[in-house]
A protein has these predicted regions:
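"…together with the soluble PPM/PP2C metallo-phosphatase catalytic core" -> "…together
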Residues: 2-155
Length: 155
């Protein structure tokens, strides 16, 4: 158990400080280049820098890389790649709005690392029926959930 705590603390610390340190820099650069939008959550017409996801993705990816160094398993690599690909789709969508059908399809392809690296467990445990193995259901669930989450986070 102790061997899991130290890598987790290192990953969390790196993620926190990379986001905390990089966010003001990203905001300054975006404001300097006049890449801002009106904040829809304020009564005043306050301008905010966009896209701000760069500092967040650096924090996520850096922590996943640290975890992968300590634990080189396919599940971490799959999440790392899927997150990065989804970030690229979101960045493209921020720069040039994608059509209604294209963004979900592009995000569905981002699920490929999870499926190709087998980073899912196809065993379902039902209290009444016991354990059932349905691999196609899990693959379909992954392909549908990545676009849903991607659209929820980056809408």
């Amino acid at each position: 158990m102790e061997q899991l705590i130290i890598p987790a603390i290192i990953a969390i610390t790196i993620a926190f400080f990379s986001v905390y340190g990089l966010t003001p820099f990203v905001i300054r650069v975006l404001e300097k280049r006049n890449i801002t939008v009106v904040d829809a959550n304020k009564k005043e017409k306050t301008m905010v820098a966009r896209p701000g996801g760069l500092s967040i993705i650096v924090g996520i990816e850096s922590s996943l890389i640290i975890l992968y160094i300590f634990f080189p398993i396919s599940e971490i690599l799959a999440v790392l790649l899927t997150t990065f690909f989804a970030f690229i789709v979101g960045l493209i969508d921020d720069k040039k709005t994608m059509s209604g059908w294209f963004k979900p399809v592009a995000l569905a392809f981002c699920a490929a690392p999870i499926i190709l690296l087998g980073a899912y467990d196809s065993n379902l445990a039902f209290p009444l029926f016991g354990t059932v193995q349905i691999p196609l259901l899990y693959m379909a669930l992954v392909v549908f959930m990545i676009p849903i989450m991607g659209n929820t986070i980056n809408s």
